[in-house]
Amino acid sequence: MDVLALVLAGGRGSRMGVLTQDRAKPALPFAGTYRLLDFSLSNLRHSGIDDVWVLVQFETQSILDVLAGGRPWDLDRSHGGLRIVPPQQESDEGEAGWHAGNAHALYANRRLIGNAAPELLLVMSADHVYKLDYSVVIAQHRRTGAD
């Protein structure tokens, strides 16, 4: 595996109030047609990144409904493609095993990530709205020899 993208979609979205009462923040509608999560996945797909893990936690079903098995982004594959990663509980710490934040989600999934052995790991949020070709960013990263 060359590049593995981790899309962090597990936050509560509590500041959104009633909008996230029954759905995860990344599943919120945007411009009447899209969901916030669409932007992250579209950027990845248009950048040629097709190993995508979505880390979920709160109101998971709303995320699963948006993901539709990865079909809208041509990520529904037998090898690679979309993988939905539930919270990993390692001990009795925290709130019933929930991740305490982004860094904790990465730490809790370190074994899964290590087993996948990607050359590069791209970590992104599921609720940001922007357009970016990650292949340009990755090429610059490799050119500079950055860690």
Tell me what each language-model feature is.
Residues 12:
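Glycine-rich FAD pyrophosphate-binding loop
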Residues 1-7, 15-129, 134-140:
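Conserved N-terminal catalytic core of the sugar/cofactor nucleotidyltransferase
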Residues 144-147:
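A short, conserved acidic/glycine-rich loop-to-beta-strand motif
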